[in-house]
Amino acid sequence: MNLKYLLLFFCLVQVLHYCYSHGDPSLSNELDRGLIPKCKLVPEQISFVLSTRENQNGVFLTLDNLSKGGILPKSDLSSIPVIFLIHGFISSANNSNYVDMTKALLEKNDCMVISIDWRDGACTHEFKILKFIGYPNAVKNTRAVGKYIADFTKLLMQKYKVSLANIRLIGHSLGAQIAGFAGKEYQKFKLGKYPEIIGLDPAGPLFKSNDCSERICETDAHYVQIIHTSNNLGTERTLGTVDFYVNNGYNQPGCYLSFLGEACSHTRAVKYFTECIRHECCLIGVPQSKNPQPVSKCTRKECVCIGLNAKTYPKTGSFYVPVESKAPYCNNKGKKI
């Protein structure tokens, strides 16, 4: 990400947040009419890319072709784990970080990975710097994408017998906020809750001061796992059942201490989680305190490992996670808990 664009992005988000939230409607209207990209979200253009061990290149799904049947490998998917993967701002499902995570998930388990591509609503196709100042409109699109995922989930369960117990949502940045909204929308069907939502450094700008109904929240699923890696593009606020603050939640090792480094830290959440899947690297979370205990003294009773098995640990709350600067990032000398 270009440094000058990132600097401008931070400045513009602050200005736009003031205009939209603090009552300067004339300026907001002018911005809406001209400067800010619309980043228009058309539900029909949201695609779901299905990857399996047999077809890792992906099959494009929509609510329309899914409802017609015959598009998925078989009609009874009750025993198959399903993982929704949701990208963030100015990104897409074919971003290399999500492709790497998809491969790691498929190597780990025989599952279906469904990557949600909402690139138009995420401002991905807008012109250069304009895509950055479209952020407020991308934020506005997140709830609609979340509802679409909830509708898609319901159809999967009704038509293909997918078990709710086998569904997990993983989202990065705005994608994490979308996962939270999907959890809220699905609960409106009165069919239960998603078992787990994993938020990888949930987007902070325009969400930090929101209450639970307007951001990812621990009530959105039975278990909500949050990985914090940046405090500007992300947020320091506790959001989930467990909140992991990697390197205290900011300035990740190996990322430069600059605005460009902030983007690096923000993306590290995805890389950390992928390494936890790929290498079964136990990034150990130690209960947060002024003087956190050494990782070497951790036991399963009071510490938790980031990853797909986090919810099998009894402890909840906030955790400090030390990491190394290079993959696989483990800073535990091979310790397992």
UniProtKB/Swiss-Prot annotation:
**Cellular component per GO?**
extracellular space
Q: Where in the cell is it found?
A: Secreted
**Where does it primarily localize?**
secreted
What residues form the catalytic site here? S173, D201, H266
Cystine crosslinks? C39-C123, C212-C217, C255-C264, C281-C305, C282-C330, C298-C303
Q: Which InterPro entries match?
A: AB_hydrolase_fold, Allerg_PlipaseA1, Lipase, Lipase_N, TAG_lipase
Q: Which UniProt keywords apply?
A: Allergen, Disulfide bond, Hemostasis impairing toxin, Hydrolase, Lipid degradation, Lipid metabolism, Platelet aggregation activating toxin, Secreted, Signal, Toxin
Give a brief account of the tissues where this protein occurs: Expressed by the venom gland.
Query: Main EC class of this protein?
Result: hydrolase
Biological process according to GO: lipid catabolic process
- Signal peptide positions are 1-21
The UniProt catalytic activity note for this protein reads: a 1,2-diacyl-sn-glycero-3-phosphocholine + H2O = a 2-acyl-sn-glycero-3-phosphocholine + a fatty acid + H(+)
Q: Which residues form the propeptide?
A: 22-33
**Database matches in CDD domains:** Pancreat_lipase_like (cd00707)
GO molecular function list: phospholipase A1 activity; toxin activity
Keyword presence, Nucleus: no
What is the E.C. number?
3.1.1.32
Q: What does the sequence similarity comment in the record state about its family?
A: Belongs to the AB hydrolase superfamily. Lipase family.
Q: What does this protein do?
A: Catalyzes the hydrolysis of phosphatidylcholine with phospholipase A1 activity. May act as an allergen and induce hemolytic activity. In vivo, induces dose-dependent platelet aggregation (nanomolar concentration) and induces thrombosis.
What is this protein identified as? Answer: Probable phospholipase A1 magnifin
Organism, as annotated: Vespa magnifica
